[in-house]
């Protein structure tokens, strides 16, 4: 896409939001409580602040304020307000390719924010535990928050990821012509590195005329030992392993497709 000569500030708002899910099987109530405590500590407010601070570094944002909170009995949230940073638009790379992991990218941002909220949960029956983190990176300016996508997916290793990217508003060029997007994008997947693509099955649902892009990701490899909390698969019978595997796969598919799957 040809570089635009704008009249004034770039008023486009670019929002990247995604949910990441981590699934676990905990056999007993004690194990379920242990998993929730473990994941709650792993993604506490301090760690999330470190991740979001590095995200700001990747997209070149100046941090104005950080609000963070751990919650009882579990969960955490962090919100960072960021400000614009002067930049020569000619230096901004708008091409459709994976972002850094991490690498400094200068951005031009205003009225922008980055936030994350976590939601650990479990059910007393069935042994399933899930951890969900909601992340949003919203910027106004010449750079897309998609540049931070690679870093965030690597930092929050997940079984399932759902990603939404939307460009809102418009900006004017020097001739007064309105532009409703200022960079090329066919798929969010084009902003992911090859190592991420090799790990997940992915599907897109895009509404190009509305500048709305959606990608869902489901981990390809399934190894039961990675989903057991304080229990080794070899300690279980073959029948128990099959029941747990079927239970986990059903849970993951329901989250991935966003609907309940009837038992067969």
Swiss-Prot record:
GO terms for molecular function: adenosylmethionine decarboxylase activity. Its cofactor is pyruvate. It is an enzyme of class 4 (lyase). GO terms for cellular component: cytosol. The keyword Zinc does not apply. GO terms for biological process: spermidine biosynthetic process. Binds 1 pyruvoyl group covalently per subunit. Its EC number is 4.1.1.50. The modification Pyruvic acid (Ser) is found at residue 112. Is synthesized initially as an inactive proenzyme. Formation of the active enzyme involves a self-maturation process in which the active site pyruvoyl group is generated from an internal serine residue via an autocatalytic post-translational modification. Two non-identical subunits are generated from the proenzyme in this reaction, and the pyruvate is formed at the N-terminus of the alpha chain, which is derived from the carboxyl end of the proenzyme. Keywords: Autocatalytic cleavage, Decarboxylase, Lyase, Polyamine biosynthesis, Pyruvate, S-adenosyl-L-methionine, Schiff base, Spermidine biosynthesis, Zymogen. It comes from the Bacteria. The record marks 111-112 as: Cleavage (non-hydrolytic). It catalyses: S-adenosyl-L-methionine + H(+) = S-adenosyl 3-(methylsulfanyl)propylamine + CO2. InterPro entries: AdoMetDC_fam_prok, S-AdoMet_deCO2ase_bac, S-AdoMet_deCO2ase_core. The active site is at residues 112, 117, 140. Belongs to the prokaryotic AdoMetDC family. Type 2 subfamily. Catalyzes the decarboxylation of S-adenosylmethionine to S-adenosylmethioninamine (dcAdoMet), the propylamine donor required for the synthesis of the polyamines spermine and spermidine from the diamine putrescine. Heterooctamer of four alpha and four beta chains arranged as a tetramer of alpha/beta heterodimers. This is S-adenosylmethionine decarboxylase proenzyme. The gene is speD.
């Amino acid at each position: 896409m040809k570089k635009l000569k704008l009249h004034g500030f770039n008023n486009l708002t670019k929002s990247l939001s995604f949910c990441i899910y981590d699934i676990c099987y905990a056999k007993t109530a004690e194990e379920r409580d242990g998993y929730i405590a473990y994941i709650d500590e792993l993604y506490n407010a301090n760690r999330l602040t470190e991740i979001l601070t590095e995200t700001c570094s990747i997209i070149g944002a100046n941090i104005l304020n950080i609000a963070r909170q751990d919650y009882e009995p579990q969960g955490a949230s962090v919100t960072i307000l960021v400000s614009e940073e002067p930049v020569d638009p000619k230096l901004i790379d708008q091409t459709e390719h994976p972002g850094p992991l991490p690498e400094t990218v200068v951005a031009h941002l205003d009225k922008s924010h980055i936030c994350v909220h976590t939601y650990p949960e479990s059910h007393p029956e069935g042994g399933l535990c899930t951890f969900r983190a909601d992340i949003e990176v919203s910027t106004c300016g010449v750079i897309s928050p998609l540049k931070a996508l690679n870093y965030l997916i690597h930092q929050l290793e997940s079984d399932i990821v759902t990603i939404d990217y939307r460009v809102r508003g418009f900006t004017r060029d020097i001739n007064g012509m309105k532009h409703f997007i200022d960079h090329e994008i066919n798929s969010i997947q084009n902003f992911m590195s090859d190592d991420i693509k090799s790990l997940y099955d992915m599907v897109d649902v895009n509404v190009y005329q509305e500048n709305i892009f959606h990608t869902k990701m489901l981990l390809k490899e399934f190894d039961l030992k990675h989903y057991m909390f304080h229990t080794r698969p070899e300690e279980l019978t073959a029948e128990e392993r099959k029941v747990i595997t079927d239970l986990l796969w059903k849970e993951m598919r329901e989250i991935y497709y966003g609907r309940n799957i009837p038992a067969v």
